Amino acid sequence: MRGTSPGGPTDLVVIRTAHTSPYENLGLEQYLTGQAAPGQCILYLWQNRPTVVIGRNQNVWAECRPEAMEEDGVLLARRLSGGGAVYHDLGNLNFTFIARSALYSVPRHLEVILKSLSLLGIPGEISGRNDLTV
C-alpha cells in the first residue's frame, strides 16, 4: 500500500499475526522496530490471549496480583518500552506503527486506522491518549 507524507511517498507494510502468545508478539514487535526502511511504515496488528502487559520500569506487585492472575490463567509479560500496565485478550486488537522518526506521527497513524475501519463499515473515534474506540 502506498501513501504520501510531508516528506514524500510512503510505503505501508501491514503485518498481521495469528499468534496469540504475548511473548512471541512482543518479540516480533521488538524485532520489527529495527526493520523499517527509509520511507516505509510498518503497521503490525496482533492479539494476545489473556495477558497483563507491563512497561519496562513497572513493579509487577504494585501493578497486578500475580497469584490471582495465575489462578485465572492470565499471563504476565513485560514490554521493553515504558508506559502503563494494560490488559489484553482476544477481544481487543493491538496495533503498532513502526517508522523512522521523519515519518512517525501518532495522529496520522490513528487516522490510517480510522480510515481502514471506515472502509470496512466500522465507525470509530479517537478517545483518550492514543486510543481508538469502535
Where are these regions (language model features)?
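Catalytic beta-strand/loop module used to bind and position nucleotide/cofactor moieties
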Residues: 90-134
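N-terminal lobe of the biotin/lipoate ligase/transferase fold
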Residues: 1-104
